[in-house]
């Protein structure tokens, strides 16, 4: 067992970005950053890392074929060692969360449970798996806001809702892209049940919901600059979802770049919220 393997199995880039996102959530809720708020980044990074490790534990047989270089199939970390490591990361994140607020602690515990349930059962469950991923993405902003109390959490509801709905749209379109591979792997996704076309319609409806959520005046950032900036973001999100709306085949969805456009729209929304919060 090497130190580098224990770092690599956490997907550190993913964990660090999640941690920084929590800080941005606090910034949006309060308009500033404080030294204690750095705890948020550490907590989210640890819990995200734990989720990534438990995912590798559950996917070990698939990784033996598709990703034999991953730490567990490569023999760099044992299954027992990975399970213990994941538990330590979750416990560490929750323990640090006790130093924050009751709201933050509750979200940390709930998200840890969802990450485990997702890896064990929801990952290959149609729609519910997509909803779990979307909730986890949006809840990071609620977690950041919750460090400022219930008022901070409420201020971040719009961004959390945008992220939740846009992520569902993107996850569904990603599933539509991967129908052939998922079928070969024995997965069961929404596009495999209702077809690519109906999945695109549902994804577009979720994108419209994200646009509606962006207009909700929950924070002090709501004003002329925000409305001008979010209008552009909304167009990007709608354009991305619309690109996938007319598709009837996985190849069409891939060629539409709908998922990439939606991801760009989500990052742009985050930038608009952050800038509006500090000006």
Swiss-Prot record:
NCBIfam families: PRK12882.1
Any one GO cellular component localisation term in the record: plasma membrane
Alphabetical list of Pfam families matching this protein: UbiA
Keyword Flavoprotein appears in the UniProt entry: no
Keywords: Cell membrane, Lipid biosynthesis, Lipid metabolism, Magnesium, Membrane, Phospholipid biosynthesis, Phospholipid metabolism, Transferase, Transmembrane, Transmembrane helix
Source organism of this protein record: Methanoculleus marisnigri (strain ATCC 35101 / DSM 1498 / JR1)
E.C. designation(s): 2.5.1.42
Protein name according to UniProt: Digeranylgeranylglyceryl phosphate synthase
Pathway given in the UniProt record: Membrane lipid metabolism; glycerophospholipid metabolism
Location(s) in or outside the cell: Cell membrane
Topological relation to the membrane, as annotated: Multi-pass membrane protein
Names of the cofactor(s): Mg(2+)
Function comment: Prenyltransferase that catalyzes the transfer of the geranylgeranyl moiety of geranylgeranyl diphosphate (GGPP) to the C2 hydroxyl of (S)-3-O-geranylgeranylglyceryl phosphate (GGGP). This reaction is the second ether-bond-formation step in the biosynthesis of archaeal membrane lipids.
Catalytic activity line of the entry: sn-3-O-(geranylgeranyl)glycerol 1-phosphate + (2E,6E,10E)-geranylgeranyl diphosphate = 2,3-bis-O-(geranylgeranyl)-sn-glycerol 1-phosphate + diphosphate
Family named by the database record: Belongs to the UbiA prenyltransferase family. DGGGP synthase subfamily.
Transmembrane regions: 27-47, 90-110, 127-147, 199-219, 222-242, 259-279
GO biological process: glycerophospholipid biosynthetic process
Top-level enzyme category: transferase
Gene Ontology MF terms: geranylgeranylglycerol-phosphate geranylgeranyltransferase activity; magnesium ion binding
Magnesium recorded as keyword: yes
């Amino acid at each position: 067992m090497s130190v580098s393997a224990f770092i690599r199995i956490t997907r550190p880039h993913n964990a660090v970005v999640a941690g920084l996102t929590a800080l941005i959530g606090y910034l949006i809720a309060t308009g500033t950053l404080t030294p204690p708020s750095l705890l948020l980044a550490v907590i989210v990074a640890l819990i995200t890392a734990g989720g990534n490790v438990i995912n590798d534990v559950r996917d070990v047989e698939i990784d033996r074929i598709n990703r034999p270089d991953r730490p567990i199939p490569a023999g760099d970390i044992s299954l027992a060692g990975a399970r213990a490591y994941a538990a330590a990361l979750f416990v560490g994140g929750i323990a640090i969360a006790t130093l924050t607020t009751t709201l933050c602690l509750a979200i940390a515990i709930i998200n840890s449970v969802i990450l485990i349930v997702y890896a064990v059962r929801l990952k290959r469950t149609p729609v519910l798996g997509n909803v779990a991923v979307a909730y986890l993405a949006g809840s990071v902003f609620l977690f950041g806001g919750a460090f400022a109390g219930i008022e901070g959490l409420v201020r971040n509801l719009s961004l959390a809702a945008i992220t939740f709905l846009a992520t569902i749209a993107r996850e569904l379109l990603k599933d539509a892209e991967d129908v052939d591979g998922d079928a070969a792997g024995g997965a069961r996704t929404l596009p495999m049940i209702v077809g690519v076309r109906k999945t695109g319609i549902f994804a577009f409806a979720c994108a419209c919901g994200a646009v509606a959520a962006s207009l909700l005046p929950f924070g002090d950032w709501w004003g002329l600059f925000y409305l001008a900036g979010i209008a552009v973001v909304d167009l990007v999100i709608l354009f991305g979802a619309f690109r996938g709306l007319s598709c009837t085949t996985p190849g069409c969805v891939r060629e539409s770049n709908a998922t990439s456009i939606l991801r760009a729209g989500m990052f742009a929304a985050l930038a608009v919220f952050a800038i509006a919060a500090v000006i």
